[in-house]
């Protein structure tokens, strides 16, 4: 791997330097010393490391002749969103920002999706989930439940890029075991540090990255997962009664996010195998991704837009599983009371602990 090689101290995580006076590697932060030979193993691990390379097969296909005859493109002049609907679509508001949309012409100029997960839940289920989402929220203004107005509920097929890849991983973790004891004068803490290595290969299928810039990535990730066993070859018939968001983030521009998700999952999966320690953290990782493929899919999402006191609130529900997410307003008065109550409880608990310690000393 190109760049500067840096050794980290397993005790404090500081950068280790070579000390010419002692001819050893020394941490300038905690003064721990290491023989140079002990670091040769690290060099061997990195010697053959190569930069990550990933080639993706082109997703999506071409539309058959006449397949898009009944599809039309609508655009929002406010947020720039583009959606696709059939002749039966009666939408007049943008599902992303709530502003009016206009018909701009016959649908054209986009890849044909490879897969689609049809809607399993209807509009009635989305309304019920919203009411369920409001329950048990102690800091939610009481009048919000009755005064919030649902401006739009729209079933939208959101574009997703699905990435497959294999990950060859070499990871090194720093793990610790801590032992504490006391005598009549002092309290002692002994911490032992261990270097743990894991090697292996993981396969990833259908890692989703949404292809729409109009919907927050965090919002879409929050309603995951989608059950891929329900994904079927795309047919335009499934768009009837719904709208489909046109992708405006290409597969190529989505690769970086896919790589980050795959790398993060790889590190977490291998870290879960390092057991029997009090703490474990990643010290170094070399992950090579290969065999990459990408597919273009449409996933079902219910978008609910509500307004209250001049503010708009957007909620999303997984149209397959019913998972529901969305931000809610906070009652500032209730929040202050809750914080005061929490502060009082913590103060009382601290006083109680101090009183018990004082009582233990006099006894």
Could you tell me what each predicted segment is?
Residues 9-12, 27-30, 76-79, 94-97:
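Short cysteine-rich clusters marking metal-coordination/redox-active sites
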Residues 18-19, 36-37, 85-86, 103-104:
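Short, non-ligating residues that shape and space the ligands of small metal-coordination modules
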Residues 111-307, 358-363:
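Charged, low-complexity helical/coil segments in non-catalytic cytosolic or luminal regions
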Residues 2-4, 35-71, 105-132:
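Intrinsically disordered, low-complexity segments
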Residues 4-6, 22-24, 69-73, 91:
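Residues immediately within or flanking Cys/His clusters that coordinate Zn2+
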Residues 337-356:
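Final/C-terminal transmembrane alpha-helix of multipass membrane proteins
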Residues 13-15, 33, 81-82, 100:
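Cys/His-rich metal-chelating microdomains
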Residues 299-328:
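Extended, hydrophilic extramembrane loops/domains of integral membrane proteins
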